[in-house]
């Protein structure tokens, strides 16, 4: 099974229905839900999603949404080793470096994001949601 690491922007596109990106991101999550591919997210993605979405939909609803998401994806730890590795990568965007470091540790085949420029030096192959769908469908 193809193992993919999902950047937070892909999840946000679905949960916040951000057009014009939501449809492709949702199609990726449907593939994860159908177990056609294995979806991974960093632990801090869950806390960041809660922070970003709670003010728009309320804490109760965001907890339900995140609980549902956790039935679909596997959470990858963000530990000291990953933080040190991300710091050593010396990227401009530290959060992107942490995502890439987590994807690498989890042995993901692809890191799925709309921000390909932010991941130019990624140790894991970067694809957009559309590119991933073309590969797996």
Where are these regions (language model features)?
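Short, well-structured N-terminal submotif of metal-dependent ribonuclease cores
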Residues: 1-41, 54-64, 121, 130-137
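Acidic, PIN/NYN-like endoribonuclease modules and their adjacent C-terminal/linker elements
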Residues: 3, 72, 101-137
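Alpha-helix capping/helix-boundary segments
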Residues: 10, 45, 82, 99, ...
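Acidic catalytic patch
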Residues: 17, 44-45, 65-90
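Short active-site oxyanion
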Residues: 34-39, 74, 107-109
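General small-molecule cofactor/ligand-binding pocket signal
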Residues: 40, 76, 127
């Amino acid at each position: 099974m193809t193992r993919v690491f999902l950047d937070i922007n892909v999840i946000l596109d679905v949960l916040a229905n951000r057009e014009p990106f939501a449809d492709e991101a949702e199609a990726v999550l449907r593939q994860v839900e159908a177990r056609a591919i294995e979806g991974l997210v960093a632990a801090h993605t869950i806390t960041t999603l809660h922070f970003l979405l709670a003010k728009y939909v309320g804490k109760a609803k965001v907890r339900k949404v995140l609980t549902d998401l956790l039935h679909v994806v596997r959470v990858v730890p963000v530990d000291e080793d990953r933080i040190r590795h991300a710091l050593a990568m010396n990227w401009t965007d530290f959060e992107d470096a942490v995502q890439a470091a987590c994807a690498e540790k989890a042995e993901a085949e692809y890191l799925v994001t709309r921000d390909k420029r932010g991941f130019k030096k990624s140790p894991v192959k970067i694809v957009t949601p559309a590119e991933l769908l073309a590969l797996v469908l």
